[in-house]
Structure formats: C-alpha cells, structure tokens
C-alpha cells in the first residue's frame, strides 16, 4: 500500500509499505477513505518529537471502511463505516473505566520508554512516535486498529466523510479544551491560536455558554475564519499588545478563561521571551516554546482557568508559576479522551448544530501529501486544514 512516511525533519515521503494485517484478535483493518494532517503532526515534521524513526507512517485523524476484523471483535463487521479516534484505548483498565481514555494503562507497548520521560505512560497514539507506541498511522491506504471494539465509532447515516472525519481528533479536542476551561454562562474566553483545533475550541465555547470569545493569532485567513465562522472578536498579536488589549476589553480584569491552543511551537511578535525561546531551540538548549502559555497565565483573571489543549513535548522554561499560584488559577490539560465525546458530538453534527467541514481549505490525494505538509507548515495558499483522500 501507499503511505506517508517520516524520514526526518521536513522530510515526508510517499512510500510503498506492506499492508497491515490482524496481529491480535481484537484488531480490525480499515480501508482509509479520508485522513487529515493535524497541527500536532507538524511537531513531528519540524523535528520536535523524540523517538521517531525513519519510515514511520504518519497520521492520526483517519476514517474509512472496515475490511477485516479479528476473531474477538464483536461491535464491528466488514463493510462498517467508521471514524477512528487518535488515542488507542483498551476500554477495561483503571483509567478507561473512568473514561480517561488518553491515559489508558494498556495500549502503549513502549510504556517503559514513556515513563522515563513523563513518570507514567499515556495511551498509545496512531502515527506519533515510538514513545507513544510506535503504531503505524492513518495517512495511508489501510490501517490496523487495535482494540477495535473500544475506539471506532460507526457512521450509519449518509453524512459525507468531510462532516464526520474530525471526530477522530480536533472536534473532541476543541470541545474538551472548552470543557476544561470551566466556562460559566456569560464568561469571556480568550483563545490563543486560530488553527484547526482552535476553530473547534471557539465553536465549543459557544456551545458551553460563553458570553464572549476572543481569538488571538497573526495569520489573516485564520483570524477571518475565527471571526466569520466562529463569531469571535479578534486580536492580531503583530498589530496589538495582547495583554494590553485584553485588559482594555475586560475593564482591566482579564478573561475568565484562557485557552492555549498553540502549544510547543508558539510565536510572539518580537517579545523578549519569544525570541529567547527560539534561540534556545535553535541551539538545542531548550525544547518547547511556551510564550503563549506564559501570556495566558499573565492575562487570565484572578481565580480563572487556563486550559491547555496545545501539545507540549518537553520542558518549559520561565513559566510564571508564581503568577499562577498567587492569582489562584486552575490549569487543566491533557490529550483528549476522544471516545468519551464521540456519541454526543456526532449527535450535534447529525442535528445540524455544527458542520465541521467549514475548517477544510485543501482536499488532496495521498500522493500530494509531502507538498501538503509544507503548505500547511508554512501557512501558504491560505491553508488551514488539509484532508487527504487515498
């Protein structure tokens, strides 16, 4: 089969690789009909994620048709149309029983590797390093899905792929981020970033009762999408000081909730800390660039909440924990427990409360994947979200 494979920093290729096979009796094989490039895939593309190996198959936002099931799979059959969550979860461990699916104790075969870096191992993730399981990803023609009774959700309606594909990751991720923000009716929420996840954060904030949503970015097309589709007020951080503007917009109090939907590759408009972060990364003296998280902590009102769906992979320098502590902030974060949200969010799509396809700007063939990575990474051609059709 054809697959998009990682071969190093900025080096993604279309390779011919063996088709996946049933390994465990709880596996299923899915023929991919649509798959997406995620913003967190760019952390791999940019070389930020350790334990990647040349030839690793990328991708964790897939859907398709079940073509084979293991002998112990009971909920799926050949021909079923499914969306596959990016997290791989067993369904029966301590954490899965608490619906903390991204904390699954069972699904990561390289748990010892993850423990050395994190203290404990999270769940395995498709196409996202050997530290997180070394699983082949979904930017391919076929995908092996472990624990197939636990992960995939069946799509029984005639909704097109583009409307349901993002149940695999970014819609649940945006929704959980808004949920983690502990929004109360009428709250003002500031969202850093206007990429694909942030667009669903914005939509979800309204669903959960926000009174105002303020979106912060510098890319015109992304700000426009946040304003037109997300009905958000916007701040271009290259044109205005974010802290000063947020204070002016909130009568000096600050937003009730701040959401970092950017993560480890944050940019700043020439601020000293942002420049220093980039210099440290260039000299291999640091990993993540936490400018946005610092700014969110400083801007959030006293007693407020900072939600962090943005991905971080290593250590953060000069995080203002004194400000967070003395302001009494709550910080909530984590990989998304996708399986928890699949049914209720699918229901919202089926009831026309939201059409997730609004975020798609580019729909391409799998062979165009390498160029699509570059276009997405460089924010060229108005690119916000790429869907690949094998």
Curated annotation (Swiss-Prot):
Where along the chain is NAD(+) bound? 193-198, 217
What CDD domains would the database entry show?
A: FDH_like_1 (cd08283)
Q: Which SUPFAM superfamilies match?
A: GroES-like (SSF50129), NAD(P)-binding Rossmann-fold domains (SSF51735)
Q: What class of enzyme is it?
A: oxidoreductase
Q: Which reaction does it catalyse?
A: a primary alcohol + NAD(+) = an aldehyde + NADH + H(+); a secondary alcohol + NAD(+) = a ketone + NADH + H(+); S-(hydroxymethyl)glutathione + NADP(+) = S-formylglutathione + NADPH + H(+); S-(hydroxymethyl)glutathione + NAD(+) = S-formylglutathione + NADH + H(+)
Q: Which residues bind Zn(2+) 2?
A: 90, 93, 96, 104
How the cofactor binds, per note?
Answer: Binds 2 Zn(2+) ions per subunit.
What domain of life? Bacteria
Which UniProt keywords are present, listed alphabetically? Metal-binding, NAD, NADP, Oxidoreductase, Zinc
One annotated GO molecular function is: zinc ion binding
PANTHER family from the UniProt entry: DEHYDROGENASE, ZINC-CONTAINING, PUTATIVE (AFU_ORTHOLOGUE AFUA_2G02810)-RELATED (PTHR42813:SF2), ZINC-TYPE ALCOHOL DEHYDROGENASE-LIKE (PTHR42813)
Q: What else is known?
A: The enzyme is equally active with NAD and NADP.
Which family, according to the similarity comment? Belongs to the zinc-containing alcohol dehydrogenase family. Class-III subfamily.
The protein's name in its UniProt record: S-(hydroxymethyl)glutathione dehydrogenase
The source organism is Methylobacter marinus
